[in-house]
């Protein structure tokens, strides 16, 4: 009986590992640069949460929070785990927007900020996700002149 339980436990462990290994990876990372003291960050958090729920599983939020040293460090680890450290380095310390990054190529596709409402933000993230997958996205909706252009780099290598 002990042998059977051991075999069953090993089979369960192997199944758990393989399920994680084959879990669907996102098409894009939505890197939310935020700080508790920044009003735009607070607005963006709510809108981005709703937008990501509308978009579904093709986008994964990565939070880079500079409110405390512990949150900053957690964000650095999350960026490292997803191999997007250059994105982290470029804008850490500049809160109030989210960069959309192709999960495969790690290329920055565009950015959204608190000027977008949740529906507009979801639509823009869907467009950027389609672009990351090499697909066309057709929409007649207008975002009223709002741009998905990212802010200039906040941290520039002096060398």
Question: What residue spans do the PLM features occupy?
Answer:
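Non-catalytic, surface beta->alpha helical segment in thiol-disulfide oxidoreductase systems
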Residues: 92-134
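A short beta-strand-turn-helix
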Residues: 19-28, 84-88
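Positively charged n-region of N-terminal signal peptides that target proteins for export
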Residues: 1-4
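Short active-site neighborhood of thiol/selenol oxidoreductases, capturing the structured segment around
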Residues: 25-38
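Short, internal strand/loop/helix patches
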Residues: 71-95, 99-101
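Bacterial N-terminal signal peptides
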Residues: 7-16
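Typically the conserved alpha-helix immediately C-terminal to a functionally engaged Cys/Sec
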Residues: 40-56
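Thiol-based oxidoreductase modules, predominantly thioredoxin-like and allied folds used
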Residues: 56-79
